[in-house]
C-alpha cells in the first residue's frame, strides 16, 4: 500500500513495540470476526487512541496478525512505525479490509505467543515491548501459554489480554475455569500486565480502545480492567 513503510532494526528509536494478535479460531464466526476487525480499526482511529499514539515525540511500532491453530497464523500488518496520523489511518484501513485467512482451526495461544516473540526479535529498537492477545477461548491446541514463557525469550515483555466473554459460550465451559481467570493465571505476564474484558464481540471496539490507550500510556474511565496477580492498580 503506497505510503506505508515497513520498519526494521534500522528504523528510528520508538517508545513501544506493540504486537496485536487477533483470535480467528473456529469459535469465531464470520460476523464476530467482522466485529473484531472493524472494532480494531475503529479503536485505532478513536480520538483518544490517536492522541495517545502521538502524545510523545517518540513513535510506536505496530505489528498485527491473526491466529488460530498451532500452525495457523498470518500477518495482517508487518512492523510499521506509527509516526503520522496518515500512517495510522492506512493501517486501520488495511486491518478492516484484510480478508480472514483461517476459519476451521482450534485455539493455540502458546503458538501465538511464540510468533509474537519472533516478531519482537525483528522489531525496531524500542523502550518497551508489549504483546496484546485477544481471544474468546482457552488454549486447546499445542503447548500452553505458560510453556511459551519458558520456550521463548519473553523476559521483560508485557503480555496483556483482551478477553471476549461470549454469554452463550459460558454454558459450554460450565464447571471449568472461566475465561477471564484463565487469562489472568495463564496468559498475561510482565511489567504492568493487565486484562481488558469485552462483553461479547459487539463490545470489542470499546474494550480495544480502552486497552490501547492504557498500553500507550494513558488511563481511561469506564474500563473493565484486571491486573495480573500481585500488581496494584
Where on the chain are the PLM-derived regions?
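Von Willebrand factor
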Residues: 14-78, 82, 86-134, 161-171, ...
